[in-house]
Curated annotation (Swiss-Prot):
GO terms for molecular function: DNA binding; DNA-directed RNA polymerase activity; protein dimerization activity. InterPro entries: DNA-dir_RNA_pol_insert, DNA-dir_RNA_pol_RpoA/D/Rpb3, DNA-dir_RpoA, RBP11-like, RNAP_asu_C, RNApol_insert_sf. Belongs to the RNA polymerase alpha chain family. It holds the Pfam family RNA_pol_A_bac. DNA-dependent RNA polymerase catalyzes the transcription of DNA into RNA using the four ribonucleoside triphosphates as substrates. This is DNA-directed RNA polymerase subunit alpha. The gene is rpoA.
Amino acid sequence: MIEYVIPKKLKIEEERSETEYYYARYVLSPMEKGYGTTIGNALRRVLLSSIPSVAIVGIRFIKPEKYHEFDTLPGVKEDILEIILNLKRIQLRADVPVRERVKMTVEKRGPGNLTAADIKVPAGFEIANPSLKIATLDEEADLFFELYAQAGKGFVPAQEMDDHPEIGWIPIDGVFSPVMKVNFRVESARVEKRTDYDKMILEIWTKKTIFPNEALKRAVDILMNHLQIITDSLPEGMPPLTTEFVPISQEEVKVEQTVSEEEAVYSKKIDELELTIRSLNCLRRDKIETIGDLLKRTEEDLLKIKNFGPKSLDEVKQKLLEKFGLSLKKGG
């Protein structure tokens, strides 16, 4: 009979809460060779792309009236594009089911700072980072605008927000994922005399709207639901497996060496993103040649590149998520 070595349980090595995020580190070991990468990559992709949340997807300026993001507001230091970039960093939590778009309002006079705490949200909603600065106002500033939020998953570019609920609506990229970053690496582990088993270390950073444990549980549920469909679709009465799964505890495992899949991804050329020629040339002119070079830049850094506008930024973000499950730093 063939034996498969599997872990007895997932070990939570570290959990902590920071001002802007939650963090947790997990260890799953030992596993048969290759399973660390298989499981780690699957979890990472689902965590970054498929955990639902609520995000701001549009804005409408009522006082003063403005109709596009390339404009300015009297008495406000930041232009509308900068304000929108800050709005995308708001961490919005909903304790009630969200089936339709939700309207929120902001009314503020200067002087002073406009922060996320100034947003009036409906019952059942909460802003997890109320101290986030959105704009700087002087004595001339007198603002009244509406924000629209909806439920979703992953990243939805502004140009795909086709349903404009009000005249003057300016769409905003839907940054729905509550998971900010996921890393995993695979180390070689020894069980008795064999040294070719896998030990998978998984790190998760989430917004303050969800705990890493909850996000991980949801990701596992999503994967299991898909795999269960395959199992349920196969004919019954198949011959039993001539294998045995042998659980081994973490204490029986010795770590030998580290092999980081993340390093391999970071060394890939940006050509693998399959960007348009315009976006690709803009990045290369700014000496961005690899995925690692790209991830060192924030969204604001990229927008400073000549001829690299919001549409190019949306394209890069979408391709990073689709191809590698990665996301850019927000900056600030």
